[in-house]
Amino acid sequence: MENIRDINIKDYSPITPPKVFIDEIPISEKSENIVSDSRKIISDIVHGKDNRILLITGPCSIHDVDAGLEYAKLLTEFSKSIKNFYIVMRVYFEKPRTTVGWKGLINDPDLNNTFNMDKGLRKARTFLNDVTSLGMPTATEFLDPFTPQYLADFVSWGAIGARTTESQTHRQMASGLSMPVGFKNGTGGSIQIAVDAMGAAQGEHAFLGINEDGQSSIIHTTGTVSYTHLTLPTILLV
């Protein structure tokens, strides 16, 4: 059996269950209200019930949490002076790669190929807690299907990126998310791929995942009927 199983696996490293992080870094009443209110506002903007423009802005990804938090403080103050825009901070912890490269704060928080994902998840959840405590809603791309169990309660807007929008795994995951979800058009530029993804995510699904206790589970979803929408790349002509 040793000659046919796990031939290319070097090691299995157990990881802390989501519930441990949720208990250690609980969401405060203030942050919970920020998340709940901002999800409603974003949904209203997407459906044309709120005339403001949704502006999701921030670093390409978070690698320095101290610098990221300083940015969040400045953005929070700036957002108070803008009336026609609803500002949400881009807080991306996972980076899909076309080939190879650094995969983000969760995957390798020390940027040294040690892949201390326990530390990465803890840092990510702590950072989300710090940002929402300022009153700033957050947006992130969900890449690994396990990640939402660790972080989603702090997130107001979720993204499915160009490299994963055609993936059944990510369409299923999106069908169970509790916030508005934007699907990007595919890497080849096809909008239809994202439209199909939106339709798939609006349906009910059953798929393999984990629960808050970290147990392998069959996840049954209701579908994000009123939450999915299309996101397109912006080209600035100067």
Where on the chain are the PLM-derived regions?
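N- or domain-start disorder-to-order transition segments that initiate the globular core
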Residues: Y12-V46
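Hydrophobic faces of well-ordered beta-strands that scaffold small-molecule active sites
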Residues: L55-T57, I87-V91, T138-T140, V181-F183, ...
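Acidic, His- and aromatic-enriched active-site or binding-groove loops in soluble protein domains
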Residues: P109-A124, W157-V181, L208-I210
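Polybasic, low-complexity association/targeting segments
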Residues: M1-Y12
